[in-house]
Amino acid sequence: MADESKFEQAKGNVKETIGNVTDNKNLENEGKEDKASGKAKEFVENAKEKATDFIDKVKGNKGE
């Protein structure tokens, strides 16, 4: 899923750049939205991973 968020960020960057070069504000804004969405998904993925790691660590220390 991390690849999906990175792809969304890259797609957004391309749209934003093309929109900027062609003076197409709609495409530029769509690109900015895609980038922000991709970054948000990546943040959530990282938070989930850290929470899971923490829970696993706590569970592992219970038996000791």
Swiss-Prot record:
InterPro entries: CsbD, UPF0337_stress_rsp, YjbJ_sf. Pfam families: CsbD (PF05532). Residues 25-40 have a biased composition (Basic and acidic residues). Residues 1-40 are annotated as: Disordered. PANTHER family: UPF0337 PROTEIN YJBJ. Belongs to the UPF0337 (CsbD) family. This is UPF0337 protein SAB0772. It comes from Staphylococcus aureus (strain bovine RF122 / ET3-1).
